[in-house]
Amino acid sequence: MQYIKSNDGIKIAVYDYNLKGKQTVFLIHGWPLSHMIYEYQISLLTNCGFRVAAVDLRGFGKSDTPACGYTYNQMSADIFSIVQRLKLRNFILVGFSMGGAIALRYMNIFKGFGVCKLILLSAAAPCFTQRSDFPYGKTVKEVNSLINLAETDRPQLCLNFSKQLFASPHSDAVIDWFK
């Protein structure tokens, strides 16, 4: 693990595996997770000969937790700082949930700098809430309930979220791992 400073001076934790891999896969996690959500994928990808770069987004994992700067624009700028520092070119960018939205913002703002392929996994994009022209996602009422729970009982919110990550039941130990 290494820290890479973002354009606003925040230390971002970056994990770089199998530096001699044939091609790089860059993994961006979703909320409220860290790069560890990709633990099994990192192992598989490196065993298949890929270099894997993974990030703990600002406020998550071992990255700094600043009071502000949690916009998709800033987080995509963080990704750009990492891409530049690691000298990544011709890499596969993967984003899960909020990480997918950040990956899309990166593609837009930085014109896909260095990216040869984009993989979105259950991306929170193009938007998170339902609209008249976008019937997917959560209703405004559901999002307001999530915000209220985040303000009043964050551990319960994270527990509820962790249970939604799986298509089939898992042990309490696995659920605890996501808290």
Where are the model-predicted features located?
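Structural signature of beta-strand start/N-cap positions in the alpha/beta core
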Residues: 24, 51, 89-92, 114-117
